[in-house]
Amino acid sequence: MGAQGFFLAVEGIDGSGKSGIVRSLAAHLGAEGRDVLVTREPGGTPEGEAIRGLVLAGADEAWDPMAELLLMTAARVQHVRRVIAPALAQGRVVISDRYAGSTLAYQGTGRGLSEAFIRTLHAEATGDLWPDLTLVLDLEAGIGLARSRRRLTGETLDEGRFESLDLAFHERIRAAFLAQAARDPGRHAVIDASGTPEEVQARACAALAPFLAQAPV
């Protein structure tokens, strides 16, 4: 657990509704009087946002998987040291739209890189900082991919590099997130992301409540 605050990550396949749930949870917790910081990965700092533009745009073959991992990790170093860790030290609730679980899923399972190496790199880069709780928004891969591709249609910023990959890739990513939750149930909660946004928010709030009840925030 963060030294004083509470660190929540929201993970899931593309199109699972992470960004909307992050906003809803932030509003809900803010209404309860909690000091909430919302951030995202890759991103969260000017340097991280620049890296985001590099790795999420263009053709899939633009980056070697190892280069992709190192870029994501470089963004996370800046994010943790300049944003997440200071906010936790101030006793804030940090909600991140993606974190290291996505690296394990996309660059590990998806790209075939060693999970052990990714975990070692993460430990060195972040001081082995992991969320107090990760909410995994679970949705059929085909539904999520269709949602995500519709969202990207007409957007001026092209962040569709992963959406360009086939359904089998996204099914592997979904399985990877579920496997992470099964291995560490004390720090994960799987949320059914089907249904209305209000229904998903209610499920997420119900899963989060017992963890926050034990947190120093």
Swiss-Prot record:
GO terms for biological process: dTDP biosynthetic process; dTTP biosynthetic process; dUDP biosynthetic process. One of its GO terms (molecular function) is ATP binding. It catalyses: dTMP + ATP = dTDP + ADP. InterPro entries: P-loop_NTPase (IPR027417), Thymidylate_kin-like_dom (IPR039430), Thymidylate_kin_CS (IPR018095), Thymidylate_kinase (IPR018094). Coiled coil: none annotated. Keywords: ATP-binding, Kinase, Nucleotide biosynthesis, Nucleotide-binding, Transferase. The keyword Aminoacyl-tRNA synthetase does not apply. Pfam families: Thymidylate_kin. Its EC number is 2.7.4.9. It comes from the Bacteria. Gene3D superfamilies: P-loop containing nucleotide triphosphate hydrolases. It is an enzyme of class 2 (transferase). GO terms for cellular component: cytosol. ATP binds at residues 12-19. The keyword Nucleotide-binding applies. SUPFAM superfamilies: P-loop containing nucleoside triphosphate hydrolases (SSF52540). Belongs to the thymidylate kinase family. HAMAP family: Thymidylate_kinase. Phosphorylation of dTMP to form dTDP in both de novo and salvage pathways of dTTP synthesis. This is Thymidylate kinase.
